[in-house]
UniProtKB/Swiss-Prot annotation:
Protein family (similarity comment): Belongs to the bacterial ribosomal protein bL33 family.
Organism of origin: Sorangium cellulosum (strain So ce56)
UniProt keyword annotation of RNA-binding present: no
Protein name: Large ribosomal subunit protein bL33B
Domain of life per record: Bacteria
Molecular function via GO: structural constituent of ribosome
Residue ranges that the Swiss-Prot or TrEMBL entry lists as coiled coil: none
Assigned keywords, A-Z: Ribonucleoprotein, Ribosomal protein
Length: 53
């Protein structure tokens, strides 16, 4: 089953993107370089959990 995750900027801490991830095949934390509109440059974005409520 694919879970929805948010991608949080490593520098400013804002959640700018969201995507899905298959936890069976990718067991580590997801890290990718993406553009942060707050800082106006490419930074590392790390996986965070979206609360279901």
């Amino acid at each position: 089953m694919r879970d929805i995750i948010k991608l949080t900027c490593g520098n400013c801490g804002r959640a700018n993107y969201h995507t899905t991830k298959n936890k069976r095949t990718m067991t580590d934390k997801f890290v990718i370089k993406k553009f942060c509109p707050t800082e106006r440059k490419h930074t590392e974005h790390k996986e965070g959990k979206i609360s279901k409520g």
